[in-house]
């Protein structure tokens, strides 16, 4: 990626050595800084890496490995990585250049206005699990949970959480929660569920009639309340058809406006980082969300954070999970082994490798495996965007905030 004259908003930095933007160099600098204290040798290797787009998984796995060995390492890694990122990315406003870390303090000439829109449904909040065309709830859900657990499809802790949710339908009345959705219209986001659970939904997404038509339609059919930003003052009686052209805020260009708008809310806020963009924009929008989350958390310490991580990443898992996966791998039928061997050979041994090949003992006395599910073809930008979110989650939890991570 290169650019002669950076556009407005959050941008990758221009590197002095090549006099242009480089997503690879930026990623290498951030990961190197993240590892610099816990493993300086690998940190230097990252900076010297000549084939970053192919070899980046090695270094993302190193982050996890060092995070396992010592309970202080994940905090150190997260602090170092985020600090570097906030001092590296640029922000442009009216032709002036700022470091991202300073963007939140830019005076806003056009503050955002608040628009509310209530859903028309009177239905009570309801939760079920969609499965094979059915909506499982009650005893049918409990029976299916038991089948999944018996078959090893879900872990016991997962089964326990589902049973608890089924036993407490009152949990799904969210009329006392104010939930901020960055990238509210995201296909993988929780908007359709929250719209049925009486939540107060602060929706942030691009000013785009198609996007807001979708959001407004979802809210209108549910029992929730939409709270949306607008640069215009809008009459409270405005209908959905009129609102769709007037709502929205851009996470990449309106960072200070969004952050300063959110801290004005008197309610506790639950911030959900679910915005997704393709390629290098995904890193930028992750950094934008991180900047806003950090700012809001500093001004409202009772704020909670939520992230949607990806299964195609690297994670530490308990020893029991790793050993169960190893046992299943060993107990495959002969036909399965032959088929897998063929695919593995054709893919130059990139697919269907034995899981959790190494178990690592931490200084806390526990043993962990590493679930290495990175897909090289997704690229280092995607991996970095997701790592930024994990770092913020790790650091926020360490600092006493409530944090939720879902992988899916």
Language model feature labels by segment:
Residues 176-191, 195, 202-205:
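Glycine-rich adenosine-cofactor-binding loop
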Residues 306-408:
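Long, contiguous domain-sized segments
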Residues 44-157:
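Low-complexity, highly charged intrinsically disordered N-terminal segments
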Residues 243-245, 249-317:
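Extended alpha-helical scaffolding regions
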Residues 1-66:
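Non-catalytic protein-protein interaction scaffold segments in large eukaryotic complex-forming proteins
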Residues 198-203, 220-225, 264, 290-307, ...:
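Structural alpha-beta junctions
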Residues 156-175:
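A short, basic/flexible loop-to-alpha-helix module at the beginning of a structural domain
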Residues 2-4, 212-265:
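Extended charged low-complexity segments that act as oligomerization/scaffolding linkers
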């Amino acid at each position: 990626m290169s650019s002669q004259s950076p556009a407005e908003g959050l941008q990758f930095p221009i590197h002095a050595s090549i006099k242009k933007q480089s997503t690879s160099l930026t990623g290498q600098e951030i990961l190197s800084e993240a590892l610099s204290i816990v493993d300086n040798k690998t940190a230097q290797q990252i900076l010297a890496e000549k084939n970053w787009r192919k070899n980046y998984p090695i270094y993302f796995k190193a982050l996890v490995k060092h995070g396992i060995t010592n309970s202080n390492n994940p905090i150190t890694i997260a602090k170092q990585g985020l600090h570097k990122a906030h001092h590296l990315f640029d922000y442009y406003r009216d032709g002036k250049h700022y470091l991202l870390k300073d963007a939140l303090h830019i005076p806003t000439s056009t503050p955002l206005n608040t628009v509310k829109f209530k859903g028309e449904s009177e239905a009570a909040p309801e939760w079920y699990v969609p499965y094979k065309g059915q909506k499982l709830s009650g005893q049918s859900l409990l029976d299916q949970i038991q089948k999944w657990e018996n078959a090893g499809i879900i872990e016991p802790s997962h089964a326990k959480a589902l049973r608890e949710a089924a036993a407490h339908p009152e949990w799904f009345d969210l009329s006392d929660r104010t939930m901020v959705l960055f990238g509210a219209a995201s296909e993988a986001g929780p908007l359709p569920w929250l719209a049925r659970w009486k939540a107060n939904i602060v929706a942030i997404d691009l000013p785009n009639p198609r996007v807001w038509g979708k959001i407004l339609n979802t809210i209108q059919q549910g029992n929730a309340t939409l709270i949306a930003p607008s640069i215009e003052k809008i009459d409270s009686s405005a209908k959905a058809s009129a609102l769709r052209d007037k709502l929205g805020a851009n996470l990449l260009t309106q960072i200070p406006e969004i952050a300063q708008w959110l801290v004005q809310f008197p309610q506790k806020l639950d911030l959900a980082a679910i915005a997704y963009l393709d390629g290098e924009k995904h890193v930028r929008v992750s950094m934008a969300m991180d900047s806003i989350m950090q700012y809001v958390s500093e001004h409202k310490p009772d704020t909670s954070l939520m992230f949607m991580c990806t299964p195609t990443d690297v994670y530490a898992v308990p020893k029991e999970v790793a050993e169960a996966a190893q046992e299943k791998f060993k107990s495959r039928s002969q036909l399965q082994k032959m088929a897998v061997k063929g695919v593995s050979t054709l893919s130059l041994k990139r697919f269907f490798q034995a899981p959790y090949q190494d178990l690592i003992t931490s200084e806390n006395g526990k043993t962990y495996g590493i679930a290495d599910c990175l897909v090289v073809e997704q690229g280092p930008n995607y991996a970095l965007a997701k790592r930024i979110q994990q770092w913020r989650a790790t650091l926020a939890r360490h600092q006493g905030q409530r944090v939720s991570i879902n992988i899916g």
